[in-house]
Each structure stands twice: as structure tokens, then as C-alpha cells.
Amino acid sequence: MKRARLIIITGLSGSGKTTAARALEDEGFFVVDNLPLVLLPEFLKLHAGSAVAGSNVAVVVDVRNKPYLEGYKQTLAEVRSAGHVVDIFFFDAVDDVLLRRYSETRRRHPLSQKEGVAESIRQERALLGGIMDLSTEIIDSSWLTPHQLRARVVHMVCGDDKGNPLAVLVQSFGYRYGIPQGSDLVMDVRFLPNPHFVPDLRPQTGLSQGVRDFVLGQPACREFLDRFNHLLDYLLPSYRKEGKSYLTISIGCTGGRHRSVAIAEHLRYAIQGEDMVVDGLHRDVAKE
């Protein structure tokens, strides 16, 4: 039987699974939506002998599979024992964003009940917690546009045409709003002087030249960047060697508007290379 590369797309309803499935389908994956997990081993056998057989398969699994979720560990073990390469992409978003998306689309939550959408989301998190713990990648779509999410998924799976380079996301965030899920490296830059307490700089962000000059001009910041760049010079090739295709570097300060933004922007361009695709995201820069 032909061995498949299998990507299981799972996660919270409204977190971007449909966008991810469409992106993989456009990249040549054979995509199946809402396949009961218990049928996965048999499906892979049938697919291997079919006229549409290909080596790349993606399956969307979520709470619509509720009756079949309990045996996921046994099913995954069976699939892997057959020689298939399995990655689990878990899509998530903060509750406030999920609630807003449901309000905007007016769609019914799969676990919809009289207690409301918030309670349905809570129950969904509980049901999918075990699968999340086993996931290969956790993708937080809270602050990503559909286009950004699609690009991220494609980079994770395919890299680009230059020998599948390492796709790096450098993102800033505010500890006030929580550490981004799916972060591989997290750096806390709250040890640096805060532009928030400089009246002229407070209304600006780390994207402005004044704030960037203030933050990057600090001796402590220059030393930090020098040490961190040396660490990345060691880590990035090591991640590539181990077969990692996507790396998320998260830089945090108190509110995610000044220090972390300035440093993330600097790093985004400092670590550019022919064997990497580097993108940037400022999760909390627009928040007050």
C-alpha cells in the first residue's frame, strides 16, 4: 500500500479549518471533510488503490465527529503503524474572537444549545483538549486575516519554491492579553525602558521611527539583540536539520504596542536569508 502524508485539520469551530482545508486542496492534497476518525485507516487503504490516489491527504476532524472522538489515540497509532506520516494541525482562537465571528456570520455552532455560544465553545475546548495535546502544530488565527492564515498553512506544508525553506513568523504581543498559542520561542522584553512613560511616545507604536529609535537605542536592547541573534544563528539551522518547516518567535512586552513591536520589526528583517521565508505580525499593536 502506498504510504501517505496525512494532515489532520482539527480545532475550534470558527478558527479557520475551512480556510486551511481549501489551501491544502489548492496545493494538491486530497481533502476529506468530517470523516469519522474510526474510518480513517480503512479510508487510507481505499484511497491508496483508487484512481485519484496521491501521496498527500488532509482530513478535517472536529466536534461534528463527537461520537467517534474517544478512540482517537488508538486510531492514530494504527495509522502510524501502517507507515503513514501524520501531522495534526490544531486551529484555535481566543474566545472573544470566536464569539465575534459567530455574531458576524450568524452561523450555528455545532454544539449549539440554550446556554449560548460561549458555553458551546467551552464544551468544545474540553472535548478537543486531548487531540490538542497531541497536535504537531497549534495555529492561533485570532489576529490573522484569511489571506494570512492561508499563507501560513501553505508555508508550513510546502515552504516555497526555494528548496522548502524554513517559514518563520516573528510576532509581537502584550503579556496583558496572554502568550500566543503555538509559540516556539518566547522572549520577554519587559526589562527594557518603556516608551509608554514618555509622553511624546505614548500615543505612538513600535512601528513609528521615534519609538524604534528609543527602544533600539538602549544599551540593554543592543546587547539583547546581539545575544539573541547569536542564539538564532545556532537554532535556526538546527531546526531545519530536524525537519521543522515552521517556527514562531514571539516577542512580548506589557501591552504589545511599543517595545515588542519595535524589536519584532527589527528581528523580522535581521534574520532574512535565502533559506528562510520570514513574516511579521503585531497581534496587539492596535489595542489600547
From Swiss-Prot:
ATP binds at G11, L12, S13, G14, S15, G16, K17, T18. Keywords: ATP-binding, GTP-binding, Nucleotide-binding. SUPFAM superfamilies: P-loop containing nucleoside triphosphate hydrolases. GTP binds at D62, V63, R64, N65. It comes from the Bacteria. Belongs to the RapZ-like family. One of its GO terms (molecular function) is GTP binding. PANTHER family: RNASE ADAPTER PROTEIN RAPZ. Displays ATPase and GTPase activities. It holds the Pfam family PapZ_C. This is Nucleotide-binding protein Pcar_1935.
